[in-house]
Amino acid sequence: MIGPVALHGGGEFLRGDEPFLEALLAAAAPRADGRSIRVAVVPTAAARGQPDVAAANGVAAFERVAATNGRTVDAREVRVVGPTSAADHGLAAELAEADVIHLPGGDPDLIPTIMPGSAAWAAIAEAHAGGAVLAGASAGAMALASWTWTSGGGMGGLMVVRGFAVVPHAKRETWEATAARFVAWAPDGLGALGLAERTGVIEEPLGPDATHVGWRVVGPGEAFWMPAPGAETVSARSGERLETPVIPL
């Protein structure tokens, strides 16, 4: 059974992000089936910066949240930071066994450049198809969508979720301006999912014949859904749900 996708607006692993991290662990518990939940923090997007720091922050945060909620986790860095490590079959084996695969933020172009066609991405897809939670924060979330923007312009994402781009670090007071910029550079018909920091959405499929995908909001901020450039925005807060259309493969 395929696992849920989770998208996060950034500020991952900081104080205040605990509800979202606990939601990821709860979603992964069925795959773990009573053993320690295996968490792989994959700092690919941070490869130009401090990937080990990003991963260490993630490992510490998951361990802290698990202890608070009476869970046991085996959280570790899986250091995929370039083509060589993406081809490493030992790292791929760790990814294939994970119950939560978390892609923290960094540079938006790195994950879509490094992952496609690699052993690492094949292992992530295998784990996700087997029920693992696939989560991305900020640039990690952007990469999972069908399209993303970078400092060099727009580029295709990994198309795990389709029909929209993820807009991290979203704020209500600046959303209109953000949406206007989005309209200026987005491909025709592409929606935008805006996510505040320390806030994310977790996929909740609505059934095999559903025409939409449900996304449960978790965290202190808001999520914003604009179904097409210039369309009216719908917002939701923690515990509420947004729906995006199912885009056929």
Name these PLM-found stretches:
Residues V73-A75, L134, A223:
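Hydrophobic anchor at the start of a short beta-strand
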Residues H89-A92, E97-V100, P108-G130, R237, ...:
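Mature, structured domains of secreted/extracytosolic soluble proteins
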Residues P104, L110-E176:
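Class I SAM-dependent methyltransferase SAM-binding "motif I" and its flanking Rossmann-like core
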Residues A40, A46-G106, L110:
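Portal/gating segments that form or line small-molecule/metal binding sites
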